[in-house]
Amino acid sequence: MQRPYIESKTFEKADIRDYEDCTFNSCDLSNLNLSGFNFTECEFIRCNMSMAKLSDTTFNEVKFAECKLVALHFEDCNEFLFSVSFDQCQLTLSSFYKRKLKNT
């Protein structure tokens, strides 16, 4: 899969932190600052989000499948509507302190 190439585009006052009903497939999001991002009804498949910053990040009805999620601090996420599910994910050293995990 090739990386998307964006050329001659102007983004002005763009808020690119809100994602709804999106699928992220084989994306490398490791070490990114995802603080304040909002993911609603999204799916991450075979993605690497290891060591990303998640301060006030919203995960609402988000599914992770076969993802590498090492050393994430889910307790830093926005608690309101926090709902995630995991299928065959690597969660080594990730923390869910005081997070309610339904069906997990």
What are these regions (language model features)?
Residues 1-104:
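Tandem repeat scaffolds
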